[in-house]
Structure formats: structure tokens, C-alpha cells
């Protein structure tokens, strides 16, 4: 990278890196640095009347207060921050004081990683700190961190632009308090869920991500191409059909926690790549699954928050079991006044028009009902509510209701106005399943690009016999949002999907050389703001010469300064 492409701070840090090497100090050492303590644990276990505890810690410098022969710095490790007291004569016990006077005071910067060996003590101001006796450079930071200042728990000069935070999550995690805690809670949520499923005796499995048929859900898939086989493949939209094959194969219960992909919109609650847990258990039904789910979520909430309640967007949500259960058609009648039971597709389409909804001819009966529920009902369910007994047209993989014709044994769990889970008494009648797939094919031919494909191998598996089974899918990302009080899905994804970062257009050196400009002057011209030769067209020759001369001197480029006449010739050549 050319020197002129760097900021002044970056240049200073690179110079410091080279000076460290000249002193025989490797700024990126390869050897293991052994630590025996962390900031949080040091503070929690400190006792004033105990013998001074020797510690070896490491972390990132987050602030410094440099004085004369003694200074302070704040070190951030994986658990938090701790103050370190640096005394010149303690870290430099002999005549050579360079470690303090040069390395610490001049060549180290905020953002650098160092190792400290010393002992724990309490300062006169009452702060538990580490008294350094040895300092080791572990990694030199070449870019300055944004400095976020905190006073009374309020951040100032914050690194808070959402796009920057999501693109540079590595910076966000370092400088913004509380961000890392979200992802530690995410890990705890998944760990608690996995532990509960393992304790229940269910087997964690892995199924294909690349699939020849995008089945298991109604969604638009991502398509890719396998060069060796010369076939199109789909990134899975769900794990359902493969997991049910394993139930056919004799597993009592199977689950998978993994990524699914849906080529659909992005908003505050949707990301095209998302994490889902799917579970299938033989000899169970959707009533059992509702009971299992509410107990599981209550356990997770207590494990993460210490209580069965979570707060999000000013609302307190109780995950204390049991949850309310409400049939979907009753929910629609309750919110819109329309009773859809027994209505035909044409009658429901007419109701949609009366409700002034935007619909189109590709939507079948199930899609129309789904649109009504989504627009008028879904957002009203704040406390956990099982919406149950969906019409068969909305549920191509679900068993028919045992006592309610035209309905299925399916539920969706609504929390804070969004779907968190989807579950069924699974359809295990292969003939019925084939008819449902054919109906989905009809919808696909009608133009519904979210209709399911016919999976002949899955039908073949069902024909060998699948026991009565209940299954559920829980959206992990939305669950983390609920448990951590976040209102956007991007806040619970370490690296959410984003548009490619815009790059500044720059002409290559050849275009400048064609104007008669020496190649060695190109970086200086671009540093001065002339990123393309076209930008030179209206330049003032005298002003440009002054800028180039200043850059030549400031950065010690040692170039022969151009004359005004030479620059005028460059500008004239742009128009030719």
C-alpha cells in the first residue's frame, strides 16, 4: 500500500511498528503468551487483606494516562477491562529505561495488544488494578479505533452508525459496551436448547445444505450450479424432509441446529441466511409439542436472564408456561369480524377486497388466509400465543385434524407480533402427501414462486412407513432477539447480510502517464483529490502545484516538484 493512501495516524503507527523492529522487538511475536487470570475474575476474587496475587494478563490497550515515571492504562480482555499501573523503574529495573520511555510512552497506541505480568492491588482511589512488573508487546494495531467515551453509563462520540457497525463488527465488539454480551447470550441460548434436547434423548444430526429439491417449506430458494454434476442445486430452505426420513429410518427423535437460506426480502426481522432448530419426535402430536416448546422456552429464558421474563421495546414478555392457544380462524374473526370457516377461495378473495388488501391471481386459498392473518392479526400477539388448527391449504406437510374437517394439526407460536416457531402433527399418509404436493405444483404453475416442489424420494420414504410424529422449527435469530431485547435481527447476527461496500472509483496509473504525468506523482495527485484524470480537467495549475509541493514536503517523497507549465500541459492533455 502506498504511503499516501494512509491517514496520518496510520502512517505514525506504521513508523512505530518499524521502530519497534529496529529496537529488536517483534510487533507480532509467534510465541505463546501464557495468561493465568482475567479482568472480571481478578476483581471478583480480590481481597484487601490477602497477600498480593501474582498474575499474567493480556489484552488490548483502551486508554492511557501518561505521566512522568508512572502511568496508567486500561486493558480490555475477553471478560472486560482492568486498570494497569505502569512504573518506569518496575518494568525497567536496570539502567536501560527504553521499555517505558520509548516503547510504552511513544511507540504503543490505543488498540495495541500487550501482555502484563505483575500483582493485584488497590490504588489510593480504591480501584482494583494490576501493578505491572513486565510488559510484552503482543500485536501492533495499524488502524486507530474510534474512541467512545462513557460518563454515567452514557456513550459519547459513539461508534453508532448501524451500517458501519454491521460491516465492521470487529470494531463494534471492541468499542461498544454490551454488544459482545448479546452474542454471549446467543451462545447460551443455543447451548441451553441443545442440552435440553440431549437430556430428552434426542439425537443431533446433520443434513445436506445443497439439495436437488428445495423442500420442507414454502419459500423462494437460492439456486447454484454444481459444475462436476452439471446440475442446478438449491441452498436448503428447511431441514424438514431429511429429518423426517431419519424418523422413517428408526430414530426416536432427531434435531438439527443449522443455517437455512431463503431468497426473499431483508428487513428488521428477516435475513436471507438464518439459523433454525428443527426437531422431530416419533409417537408425539402437536399438543405434546406445544407443552414441550413452552417448557423449553421458559427454561432458556431463565438460563439467559435469570427470570422467565424478557423485556423488548418497552414490553415485558412472560415465557412462563403455559401459553395461550387460539385457532387461527378464531383469531381472524376476532381481529377482522370475518368468519372464514367453510369459505371457498373466491369468497375469501372477495373478503380480501373488502378489507382493501393487495392480492393477485397467483394466490390460492391458503396464501389468501395467510395474508389476512399477517396483515390484521400477527402483529397483535405480544405475549406468547400458540395459533393453532390451520386450514389444509396452508399446510401441505401437516396431518389432517382428527376432529375438525378441512383443518390441520398445526400451530405457529407468535411472540411480540412475529412468528417464532412452526409445528405440526406430521403428515405420514403417503397418498395424502402426494396429493398435497400436486396441489402445490398447481400453485407453482399458477405463478406462486413459494410453492413446494414434489420430492419423489420423500414420498418413497413415507411409503415404507413413518410412525406418528410431531415436528417443530424454531427461529434461533428471532429467539435471540426476544431473549436479549433487540428489535432488529441485524443486532443478533455477528455478520448480517449487506450490500457490497461501495468503492471509490480511481483511475490506474497508465491513464495519468498518458497525459505526460510521471507515474511517481500519481499517488500524490490522488491524495490531493484527483482520483480520475477527468477530475484534472478544471484544475487550477498554480493551486495544484502548491498542493503537490506541500505533499512532497510533508511526506518526504523526495520528488522533483513540477513546474506550473508542466501542470498546465497535463490539464490541457485531459481534453485531447
UniProtKB/Swiss-Prot annotation:
User: Main subcellular localization, coarse class?
Assistant: cytoplasm
What's the name of the protein?
Lysine--tRNA ligase
Q: Which cofactor does it need?
A: Mg(2+)
One term of GO molecular function: tRNA binding
Q: Which key words tag this protein in UniProt?
A: Aminoacyl-tRNA synthetase, ATP-binding, Cytoplasm, Ligase, Magnesium, Metal-binding, Nucleotide-binding, Protein biosynthesis
Share an example GO biological-process annotation for this protein. Answer: lysyl-tRNA aminoacylation
Family membership, please give it.
Answer: Belongs to the class-II aminoacyl-tRNA synthetase family.
Amino acid at each position: 500500500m502506498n504511503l499516501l493512501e494512509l491517514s496520518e495516524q496510520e502512517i505514525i503507527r506504521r513508523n512505530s511498528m518499524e521502530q519497534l523492529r529496529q529496537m529488536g522487538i517483534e510487533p507480532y511475536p509467534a510465541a505463546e503468551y501464557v495468561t493465568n487470570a482475567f479482568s472480571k475474575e481478578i476483581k471478583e476474587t480480590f481481597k484487601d487483606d490477602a497477600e498480593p496475587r501474582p498474575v499474567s494478563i493480556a489484552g488490548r490497550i483502551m486508554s492511557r494516562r501518561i505521566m512522568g515515571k508512572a502511568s496508567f492504562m486500561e486493558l480490555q480482555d475477553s471478560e472486560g477491562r482492568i486498570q494497569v499501573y505502569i512504573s518506569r523503574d518496575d518494568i525497567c529495573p536496570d539502567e536501560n529505561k527504553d521499555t517505558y520511555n520509548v516503547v510504552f510512552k511513544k511507540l504503543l497506541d490505543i488498540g495495541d495488544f500487550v501482555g502484563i505480568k505483575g500483582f493485584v492491588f488497590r490504588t489510593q482511589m480504591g480501584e482494583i488494578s494490576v501493578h505491572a512488573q513486565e510488559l510484552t508487546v503482543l500485536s501492533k494495531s495499524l488502524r486507530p479505533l474510534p474512541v467512545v467515551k462513557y460518563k454515567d453509563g452514557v456513550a459519547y462520540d459513539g461508534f453508532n452508525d448501524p451500517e458501519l457497525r454491521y460491516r465492521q463488527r470487529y470494531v463494534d465488539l471492541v468499542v461498544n459496551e454490551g454488544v459482545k454480551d448479546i452474542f454471549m447470550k446467543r451462545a447460551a441460548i443455543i447451548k441451553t436448547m441443545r442440552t435440553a434436547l440431549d437430556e430428552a434423548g434426542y439425537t443431533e444430526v446433520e443434513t445436506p445444505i445443497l439439495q436437488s429439491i428445495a423442500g420442507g417449506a414454502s419459500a423462494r430458494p437460492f439456486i447454484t450450479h454444481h459444475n462436476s454434476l452439471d446440475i442446478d442445486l438449491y441452498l436448503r430452505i428447511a431441514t424438514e424432509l431429511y429429518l423426517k426420513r431419519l424418523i422413517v429410518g428408526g430414530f426416536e427423535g432427531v434435531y438439527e441446529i443449522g443455517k437455512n437460506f431463503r431468497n426473499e426480502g431483508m428487513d428488521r426481522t428477516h435475513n436471507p441466511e438464518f439459523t433454525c432448530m428443527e426437531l422431530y419426535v416419533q409417537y408425539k402430536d402437536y399438543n405434546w409439542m406445544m407443552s414441550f416448546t413452552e417448557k423449553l422456552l421458559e427454561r432458556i429464558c431463565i438460563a439467559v436472564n435469570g427470570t422467565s421474563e424478557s423485556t423488548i421495546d418497552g414490553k415485558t414478555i412472560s415465557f412462563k408456561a403455559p401459553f395461550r392457544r387460539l385457532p387461527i380462524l378464531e383469531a381472524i374473526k376476532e381481529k377482522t369480524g370475518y368468519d372464514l370457516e367453510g369459505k371457498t377461495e373466491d369468497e375469501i378473495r372477495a373478503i380480501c377486497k373488502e378489507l382493501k388488501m393487495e392480492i393477485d391471481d397467483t394466490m390460492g386459498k391458503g396464501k389468501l388466509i395467510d395474508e389476512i392473518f399477517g396483515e390484521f392479526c400477527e402483529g397483535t400477539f405480544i405475549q406468547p400465543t400458540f395459533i393453532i388448527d390451520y386450514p389444509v391449504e396452508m399446510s401441505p406437510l401437516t396431518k389432517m385434524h382428527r376432529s375438525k374437517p378441512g383443518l390441520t394439526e398445526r400451530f405457529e407460536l407468535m411472540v411480540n407480533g412475529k412468528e417464532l416457531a412452526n409445528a405440526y402433527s406430521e403428515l405420514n399418509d403417503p397418498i395424502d402427501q402426494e396429493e398435497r404436493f400436486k396441489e402445490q405444483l398447481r400453485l407453482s404453475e399458477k405463478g406462486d414462486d413459494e410453492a413446494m416442489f414434489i420430492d419423489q424420494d420423500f414420498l418413497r420414504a413415507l411409503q415404507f412407513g413413518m410412525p406418528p410424529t410431531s415436528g417443530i422449527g424454531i427461529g434461533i435469530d428471532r429467539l435471540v432477539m426476544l431473549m436479549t431485547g433487540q428489535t432488529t435481527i441485524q443486532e443478533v447476527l455477528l455478520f448480517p447480510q449487506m450490500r457490497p461496500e461501495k468503492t471509490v472509483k480511481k483511475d490506474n496509473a497508465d491513464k495519468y502517464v498518458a497525459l505526460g504525468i510521471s507515474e511517481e506523482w500519481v499517488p500524490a495527485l490522488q491524495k490531493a483529490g484527483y482520483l480520475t484524470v477527468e477530475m484534472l480537467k478544471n484544475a487550477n495549475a498554480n493551486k495544484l502545484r502548491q498542493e503537490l509541493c506541500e505533499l512532497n514536503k510533508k511526506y518526504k517523497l523526495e520528488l522533483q516538484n513540477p513546474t506550473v507549465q508542466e501542470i498546465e500541459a497535463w490539464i490541457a492533455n485531459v481534453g485531447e
